[in-house]
Amino acid sequence: PALSGAKNIKSLYAKAYKHPTETVTGVHKDPEQDATNLGVGKRHSECWDCHNPHQAQTGSHTVAGTGGNLIGKVLLGQWGVEPSWGTTAWVTASSYLKQVFTNTTGFKQYQLCMKCHSSYAFASTPPTGITDQAIELNPYNRGAHPVRAGLNSQTGSTTPKPLAATQVSAPWTARGTQTMSCSDCHDSDVASDPKGTHGSAAARLKKGTGIYWPTNASGVLYNLG
């Protein structure tokens, strides 16, 4: 019988788009302490790759605000990597520093994602259908989602760095200072489902009603003017 009060995570893996937790087996090694088992030909996603069953606690991250990219208690005990870049836009990180999540005040959710979704895992050759998030979140790019830091800290951006007030919706109104987590956009398409990047009916594991990218519902590219 199901454990009383437990989240039905398994149901999310029946959705069209999901991490390959049930479809790739026999690849994970315990323990995985670095990138040697994360690259092309070794791609996998076990529960343990994101959660430490001995240290995880109840509680997801707080959405929006200046601490919107901090991990939630569900990620305690896991590890990720912090990228370091040079001064050139649109290139991947030059190095990565391992981060072990011992608290919820000094570690960021993107660090967990970067350990598999960046050149840390696959060097200069991303797997088919995967992009290097260390390139896309490079602080010297002209723009980026405020995953690593608030937009006022996007070094390569020009003034005004944040979007205009008319271009954002709640809770993303603290323009320039607030940060966000990967799972703020990549989550189940059903709001009542358990939180996290487990599975979605929308491509690229997107959540909510704004599931159109790079075009809007009419098939037209977005215009921020």
Residue ranges and their predicted role:
Residues 1-225:
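A motif-centric signal for short, conserved binding hotspots located
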